[in-house]
Curated annotation (Swiss-Prot):
Pfam families: MinE
Coiled coil: none
Entries under InterPro entries matching the protein: MinE, MinE_sf
GO biological process: cell division; regulation of division septum assembly
Protein family per UniProt: Belongs to the MinE family.
NCBIfam families: minE, PRK00296.1, PRK13989.1
Official protein name in the record: Cell division topological specificity factor
Organism, scientific name: Laribacter hongkongensis (strain HLHK9)
Domain of life: Bacteria
Sorted UniProt keywords: Cell cycle, Cell division
Function: Prevents the cell division inhibition by proteins MinC and MinD at internal division sites while permitting inhibition at polar sites. This ensures cell division at the proper site by restricting the formation of a division septum at the midpoint of the long axis of the cell.
Length: 89
């Protein structure tokens, strides 16, 4: 073992360094993702189910996911029409 290797240690291969960095970036992005993949589909399914009973427009439903420390809160806001317009034909 040469003196340089003793002082600085063995160098990692570029591919393994790149892989480690990519894993860190992916883990960070997964944790920082504001909206899970299923929210748009959940919103569409809610629209379909609620439309069976009440006449609503797609923009009348808002689905949000909020994170607070270790807690996740799914918030669903639905704007309902006036009572005389609620029935579905």
């Amino acid at each position: 073992m040469s003196l340089i290797e003793k002082l600085f240690g063995k160098r990692q291969k570029t591919a393994s360094i790149a892989r480690e960095r990519l894993q860190i970036i992916l883990a960070h992005e997964r944790n920082g993702r504001a909206e899970p993949d299923y929210l748009p589909q959940l919103q569409q399914e809610l629209i379909a189910v609620i439309s069976k009973y009440v006449k609503i427009a797609p923009e009348d439903i808002k689905v949000q996911l909020e994170r607070q420390d270790d807690l996740e809160v799914l918030e669903v806001n639905i704007v309902l029409p006036e009572p005389q317009q609620r029935t579905v034909a």
